[in-house]
């Protein structure tokens, strides 16, 4: 089972959007293989082509998302049933989606998306920004919650690093697994996330976005 495979372990997010230098399904598949060889237990990936390429290249469980913008909503991570259905054509064992309290495109209830995921025999992951959103996600039927959106909504704290308080509170008060994700820049951040009670953790930019890694080094030079 995908959840057991990532328990206590690192998931690496391999994503590059069209405006980024490494945008290529082939490159993302090689990035996933490199992550697997480094000891990653799972991969988080964006778009059907990337997920399919990664699934062919490595055997790790995949957390799948589709990022798409809509005019009537700020939500862009697996926002509608269209994106869910696209992901269900892939091998992604876990389907992640924005579960913030913001209005979804078309006003579709997030519960409908979760139900579709479960009907297909997959797991649903809630990308949240606050404890209340994580609590509601658990009640809605999500199989796990993540702290992905903390700092990316108008009403969540703006932090330089991970939202450790959110990770800790979710781990203490919720029954579903808590996935630490967002601004995990250093190995020490990862260690602390697990000390706060994270079930698993996702690291992206610090591993797979060379432009961000380079900028972090350049910043030190002033």
Segments from the language model and where they lie:
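Solvent-exposed alpha-helices and their adjacent loops that cap or buttress functional pockets
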Residues: 1-5, 88-89, 116-118, 169-173, ...
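Glycine-rich phosphate-binding active-site loops on the catalytic face of alpha/beta enzymes
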Residues: 15-17, 66-70, 90-104, 144-157, ...
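Active-site-adjacent beta->alpha loops and helix N-cap segments on the catalytic face
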Residues: 21-25, 44-63, 74-82, 99-117, ...
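Glycine-rich beta-strand-to-loop/alpha-helix junction loops that act as flexible
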Residues: 179-184, 202-206
């Amino acid at each position: 089972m995908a959840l057991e495979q990532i328990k206590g372990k690192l998931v690496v997010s391999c994503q590059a959007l069209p405006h980024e230098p490494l945008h290529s399904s082939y490159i993302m598949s090689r990035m996933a293989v490199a992550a697997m060889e480094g000891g990653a237990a799972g991969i988080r990936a964006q778009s059907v082509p990337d997920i399919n390429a990664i699934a062919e290249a490595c055997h790790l469980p995949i957390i799948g998302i589709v990022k798409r913008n809509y005019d009537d909503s700020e939500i862009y991570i697996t926002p509608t049933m269209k994106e869910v259905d696209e992901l269900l054509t892939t091998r992604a064992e876990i389907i992640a989606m924005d579960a913030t309290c913001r209005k979804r495109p078309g006003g579709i209830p997030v519960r409908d998306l979760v139900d579709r995921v479960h009907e297909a025999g997959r797991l649903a992951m809630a990308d949240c920004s606050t404890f209340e959103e994580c609590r509601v996600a658990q009640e809605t039927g999500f199989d796990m919650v993540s702290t992905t959106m903390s700092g990316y909504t108008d009403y969540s704290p703006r932090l330089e690093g991970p939202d450790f308080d959110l990770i800790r509170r979710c781990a203490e008060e919720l029954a579903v697994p808590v996935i630490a994700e967002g601004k995990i820049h250093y190995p020490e951040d990862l260690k602390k996330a697990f000390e706060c009670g994270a079930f698993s953790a996702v690291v992206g930019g610090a591993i797979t976005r060379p432009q961000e890694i380079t900028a972090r080094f350049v910043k030190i030079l002033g």
